[in-house]
Amino acid sequence: KFYGLGADGTVGANKNSVKIIGDNTNKYCQAYFSYDSKKSGGFTCSHLRFGDHPIRSTYLVTTPNFVACHVQAYLHMYDVTRGLRKNGTFLLNTIWEGEELAKNLPNKVKKYFAENNITVYYINATKIAQEIGLGNRTNTILQSAFFRITGVIPVDLAVEQMKKFIVKSYGKKGEDVVNKNYAAVDRGGEYKQLTVDPAWASLEVEAAAANNDPAFINEVVRPINAQDGDLLPVSAFKGIEDGTWHQGTAKYEKRGVAAFVPEWNPETCIQCNKCAYVCPHAAIRPFVLDANEQAGANFPTLKAVGKQFDGMTFRVQVDVMDCL
């Protein structure tokens, strides 16, 4: 089971993985891919099955042996360990390492790892992709890590076949793109294993933070966004049986999934506000501050341009939780 971000290449890589395994072994394969309505930048989940006998399962994977979480923010947004079998394997794409990773993992996740004897691997595929020149396309790196960790087919054969698919998929884009993806395959082996502390089994799961958001957001919208919409009772939709939906619910999402966020440079800013105008997620916001609002602030500002803003300051602020 693979959790990814729309347009990060996870789904495409998994389609290739199924073809590689199906074409080069006697195993039976099955794959299903689910997406949310955001498309690029949205939630994706790949459900893959491999076996030595015909697969007749007509439902999603609910008890996987292997789970890969390609977006570290998902640890706090979704129940990514749900159903992961005892003695299973978990792969995480993260910027954290070692003790820092252990510190930042939610207690719920650490508790599950310890109670179910999960083998945990991690890799900073985001950093590797940047170093190679692939931008946010972490798919090939993580696909390579999957084959190396699971051993579902011999690693040498997997590498050979992945590189064949790279030529098929990216050959028309030029030799440079092909070579970058070759490098991604080779660097997929840079994963590390996280030591799971048995003491984690006794950790208390953190309670959800209290908020003053409307009941509709907490009781309907958030469970749906957390991929738990199937668990909602019919009574949750009382009053909206006709499909009516409240407006402005997106402002409560605050997903925080951006690996990189733009930084305002006051030295080159001419206060044209075009950056805010073209930002498709309204994450770049210009502000004009009066003396009271500016008092005690420790962030850089500029003298606001325009007679109507005399004595006021200007700043552009990026909302890292809304950025994509």
Residue locations for each model-derived region?
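Active-site cofactor/cluster-binding pocket
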Residues: 1-226
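Ferredoxin-type iron-sulfur electron-transfer modules and their immediate structural context
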Residues: 158-159, 171-323
